[in-house]
């Protein structure tokens, strides 16, 4: 059987985005622009984040947490007692039905006295954490990782802004530590023998899937994953495999970027192939603040005019998350 063709996913050295050399930054921006208008994906290399430590700490957490602890941390979709946990917490596997499981946490600055927590603004939650005695150092590591990947994402947003002919802070001015709605999700895809048939979906083309086609609900997504190829991107000739790289971050635009650029930078449609191997998928969904709104424009037109209406990030995120669950089910 012939192997699936590989998608063009370039490796882009993003280190200039942390510096002051505008000529070098523009080289990165041009590479981001080309990737965004091709498959929609690129690998960010020389990103400055210790991904091996991330992988090791995540594996340690996944293999040490008990079923009882998972239940105590479970989001409302699984544990009805946790009415305030819509996004943050543990997403359970379900025997014979669902194999994947994950732990999601939000902005560490969302503490009980945060104004947007106090006002019960939707999509804002206080994180829940496992017992420090049972998982020493995990919370400290996880919160620090949030800010590490936040810093990388800020640099990437500067690159996207330059790629679109805007000022460097065009996106990052809306991406603030005090109120960004970004999330880290530590996803575990386990090896199971036997693997429950009900946990495997089948696409129209016969491909076995773990998660069906979708666009990301984000401005951009910054993903670390194991060295196990699993993602496919839809192109005119069909779905193409994305090669894995466990030293780099896989970056793509979400549907908010597609909306505000009139689809000049589309959100690539992609899916997760079923692979019965132990692996990690650790996305950072780059989300702006609830009240932030980026005015849509069309970069392909000299006057930039578009019929796309402005939408606040909070409204976009609420609607997008609900739509994704309705389409593909609870993750």
From Swiss-Prot:
Major site of localization recorded for this protein: cytoplasm
UniProt cofactor(s): Fe(2+)
Residues that bind Fe(2+): 214, 216, 270
Binding locations of 2-oxoglutarate: 279
Entry-linked InterPro entries: DIOX_N, IPNS-like_FE2OG_OXY, IPNS-like_sf, Isopenicillin-N_synth_CS, Oxoglu/Fe-dep_dioxygenase_dom
Localization, UniProt: Cytoplasm, Cytosol
Pathway: Antibiotic biosynthesis; penicillin G biosynthesis; penicillin G from L-alpha-aminoadipate and L-cysteine and L-valine: step 2/3
Binding site for N-[(5S)-5-amino-5-carboxypentanoyl]-L-cysteinyl-D-valine: 87, 91, 183, 189, 214, 216, 281
Positions with a binding annotation for isopenicillin N: 87, 91, 183, 189, 281
GO-annotated biological processes: penicillin biosynthetic process
Catalytic activity: N-[(5S)-5-amino-5-carboxypentanoyl]-L-cysteinyl-D-valine + O2 = isopenicillin N + 2 H2O
Name assigned to this protein: Isopenicillin N synthase
Organism: Penicillium rubens (strain ATCC 28089 / DSM 1075 / NRRL 1951 / Wisconsin 54-1255)
Upper lineage: Eukaryota, Fungi, Dikarya, Ascomycota, Pezizomycotina
């Amino acid at each position: 059987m012939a192997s699936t063709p590989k998608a063009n996913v370039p490796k882009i050295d993003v280190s200039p985005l942390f510096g002051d050399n505008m000529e070098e930054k523009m080289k990165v921006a041009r590479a981001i622009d080309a990737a965004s208008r091709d498959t929609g994906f690129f690998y960010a290399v020389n990103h400055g984040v210790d991904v091996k430590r991330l992988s090791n700490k995540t594996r340690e957490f996944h293999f040490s947490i008990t079923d009882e602890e998972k239940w105590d941390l479970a989001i409302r979709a699984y544990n009805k007692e946790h009415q305030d946990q819509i996004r943050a917490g543990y997403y359970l596997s379900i025997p014979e039905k669902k194999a994947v499981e994950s732990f999601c946490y939000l902005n560490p600055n969302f503490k009980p006295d945060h104004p947007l927590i106090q006002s019960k603004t939707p999509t804002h939650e206080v994180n829940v954490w496992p017992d420090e005695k049972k998982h020493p150092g995990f919370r400290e590591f996880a919160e620090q990782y949030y800010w590490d990947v936040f810093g990388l994402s800020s640099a990437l947003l500067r690159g996207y802004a330059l790629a679109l002919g805007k000022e460097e802070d065009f996106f990052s001015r809306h991406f603030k530590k005090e109120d960004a709605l970004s999330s880290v999700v530590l996803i575990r895809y386990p090896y199971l023998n036997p693997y429950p048939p009900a946990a495997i979906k089948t696409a129209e083309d016969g491909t076995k899937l773990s998660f069906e086609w979708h666009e990301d609900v984000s401005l951009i997504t910054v993903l670390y994953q194991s060295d196990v190829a699993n993602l496919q991107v839809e192109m005119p000739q069909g779905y193409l495999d994305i090669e894995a790289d466990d030293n780099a971050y896989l970056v793509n635009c979400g549907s908010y970027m597609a909306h505000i650029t009139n689809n000049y930078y589309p959100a690539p449609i992609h899916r997760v192939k079923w692979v019965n191997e132990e692996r990690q998928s650790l996305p950072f969904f780059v989300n702006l603040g609830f009240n932030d709104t980026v005015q849509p424009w069309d970069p392909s037109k000299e006057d930039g005019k578009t019929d796309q209406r402005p939408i606040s990030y909070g409204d976009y995120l609420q609607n997008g998350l609900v739509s994704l669950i309705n389409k593909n089910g609870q993750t």
